[in-house]
Amino acid sequence: LVCQIDLLESIAKLVNVDVKNTDSQELLDVFIGKSAKGRTSLVIEANTKTAFRQGDWMMIPPYPGDSILEEVNIEMGNDKEFQLYNLKKDIGQKNNLAKAQPKKLKELIKNFELIRGDNYNNVEKIELK
């Protein structure tokens, strides 16, 4: 698991520059193929909302709003309840396992809130201009 933000710390190491960035992780060996071990988790943001990836699991907190942005026919990830997906078995995120896997959901919520805080649902409404 890697993220484009990890390029900052990784390229900095490559050119021997010291940078201080709490979001970026130095994963140069992963990017150049010397290692397959990247991040264990990642907070993901889209449309002003955040979700949490940990290993094969994706947790999307409840957010208000329409599940589909009709003007452009884009799925927004909004739901009244938590969503939990095993991406190894369900890459399309069709089978919400939140009710079937309450311990896993609780673990991901806890780890997400350690990074993001518990005010994650205070988001702006997306506006097309």
Locations of regions flagged by a protein language model:
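Active-site-proximal N-terminal segment of extracellular/periplasmic enzymes that hydrolyze or transfer
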Residues: N95-K103
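A generic structural signal for ordered secondary structure
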Residues: L84-N86, A98, I109
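Exposed alpha-helical structural elements
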Residues: E26, K104-E107
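Charge-dense polyanion-binding interfaces
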Residues: E107-K129
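Intrinsically disordered, low-complexity polar regions and short flexible loop motifs
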Residues: D90
